[in-house]
A protein has these predicted regions:
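Flavin-dependent oxidoreductase catalytic cores
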Residues: 1-396
């Protein structure tokens, strides 16, 4: 019988167990987007903690796709390959596979960060990130982005990564192409689900020509809260399209940034938001008492929610044969066991539990602990805008 600690494989890559560290922006790259010694040590700690596999924080494939969050990884130049090789070799010492998540942030960045205009499939301003209306991408610009993704995949392979993960969720560029909420084009890149998927299909086709059977995973939304966003019915189509395009595994997440994701659960850290968020710092403090209830109502769940992507993952797993990874509000070992044993998913992924406890998998396996120590204070999610990720444990 399958369980959370049974060995398994993704595209032939052996995992010691079925618990994966989901991509988490650490904010620990250097000024050029190379991994630093501090970041490598964090990944070593995860590997020592016997995690099944690591998916890195997101790495941008080109300069205009760089995140406004502090010290993002970049995979935009060949000169970066040796830095990543060092990272991979250090992690592989502990027999832990590591996948590089690659992305383009699209409209979820600032021109002052990238030094270039922000871009998107459609000229629709992001409510949280973008101070300007993004430039609508032309055919030639889309083709250049496709090329950059493919080259990034080649670089990841040369660096020794066990595979890559395409970031198709959370409102970044590829996510915004997939979502009818953000993609209002009426050409071959917009309209139908097939057209909105076209950019991903082209990346996969061209990547397969270059790297053949090199593992390519994807992270996608099972749903979006926006009325005209992706819903489960369309997510099923996207998942099937990914499988047809020779994707090797799919991680199920949800939401986009301007919806507040569903990440703010439980405590609403308004003081932290006021201190770190770029929009709040532009507002007079006298307005804070009026702003707080509006933000809390719009972006936060009134109480912690757990396993909030499981229903989507269950339905998607019924429709495809490639492995399904579920992330989102997983805190208890019992839940991880149940999801795997009931074959509701093939792997489970976590982020915040690894921020507070990099060795949580080992503790679970040795029966020293049954639940993450994460208290869902949400400070880590807010603080990462200006400082490297860490656990605040409810204290600023």
């Amino acid at each position: 019988m399958k369980d959370a600690f049974s060995e398994s494989k993704i595209a032939g890559i052996k995992l010691r167990n079925r618990i994966i560290r989901s991509a988490t922006h650490e904010g620990l790259a250097d000024d050029f987007g190379n991994p630093t010694e501090e970041l490598i040590k964090k990944y070593e700690d995860l590997a020592k903690g016997e995690v099944g596999a690591i998916i890195t924080g997101y790495a941008a494939v080109m300069q205009n796709g760089k995140s406004p969050l502090i010290n993002m990884l970049m995979i935009d130049k060949d000169e970066k390959i040796p830095y990543y090789t060092e990272l991979v070799d250090r992690v592989h010492q502990y027999n832990t596979p590591i996948f590089l998540q690659i992305t383009h942030c699209g409209r979820q960045t600032f021109s002052r960060t990238t030094g270039m205009p922000t871009v998107a499939p459609s000229p629709i301003k992001d409510k949280l990130y973008n101070e300007d209306i993004p430039h609508e991408l032309t055919d030639s610009e889309i083709d250049e982005i496709i090329k950059c993704f493919v080259i990034a995949i080649e670089r990841a392979k040369k660096a020794g990564f066990d595979g890559v993960q395409l970031q198709l969720s959370h409102g970044y560029l590829l996510s915004s192409f997939l979502s009818p909420h953000m993609n209002k084009r009426n050409d071959k890149w917009g309209g139908s689900t097939e057209n909105r998927f076209r950019i991903v299909k082209k990346i996969m086709e061209r990547a397969r020509e270059k790297v053949v059977d090199y593992p390519i995973l994807a992270k996608m939304n099972g749903y979006e809260k926006s009325k005209d966003g992706i819903k489960l019915e369309e997510a099923l189509i996207i998942a099937r399209n990914l499988e047809k395009a020779s994707c090797d595994a799919i991680e199920i997440s949800c939401g986009i940034a301007e919806e507040g994701f569903v990440g703010i659960r439980g405590e609403f850290p308004f003081d932290m938001i006021a201190q770190h968020n770029h929009l709040m710092q532009k507002m007079p403090k006298i307005l804070y008492p009026f702003i707080k209830p509006v933000l809390k109502h719009s972006f936060a769940s009134p109480e912690p929610r757990y396993l909030y992507n499981l229903d989507s993952a269950i339905e998607i797993k019924k429709n495809i044969k490639i492995p399904v990874i579920v992330v989102g509000g997983i805190r208890k070992l019992e839940d991880a066991y149940n999801m795997i044993q009931r074959e509701q998913c093939d792997f489970i992924a976590m982020s915040r539990p690894f921020i507070i406890e990099p060795t949580i998998v080992k503790k679970f396996k040795e029966n020293k602990q049954q639940q993450s120590k994460c208290i869902d204070c949400n400070y880590c999610q807010i603080g990462v805008e200006k400082t490297p990720v860490k656990c605040y444990y409810g204290k600023m």
